[in-house]
Amino acid sequence: MIDNRLAPYGAFILRVALGVMYLAHSLVLKLYVFTLAGNAQFFGSIGLPAWFGYAVFFAEAIGGALLVLGVYARPVALALVPVLVGAAWVHWGNGWVFSSPDGGWEYPVFLVVASLAVALVGEGAYALKPTPPALVTRFARA
């Protein structure tokens, strides 16, 4: 049984941890380690348009910040799922374990699940701008 007194804090921890992960992957890896130009070049090297590298950077950076702040976390988490599905696709041939050479697909798939969990359970405690109830109701009926 879910403890309704503590559940908002569990959702808060999940939301913030997921947001920090997106921020780390965008700002640390894509901006400082690989650089934006290098990231775009990588996307081009795997047969995708190079501009996808910039789009993914901005999606992760903006989405991560919105998740940490708790601004419309449900739709933001759902909108970020395709980014991680794409990451899983890129790493698929490397095997399951993320510590494999060039990274496996386990971590991106886990983050897809975590993003879906945030989309389902909501922002939790300390959200600056929770998802409007009308949007949640519409989402639940879909």
Predicted regions and their residues:
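Extended, low-polarity transmembrane helix blocks
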Residues: M1-L31, A50-F58, I62, V68-A142
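Membrane-interface interhelical connector segments
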Residues: L31-G47
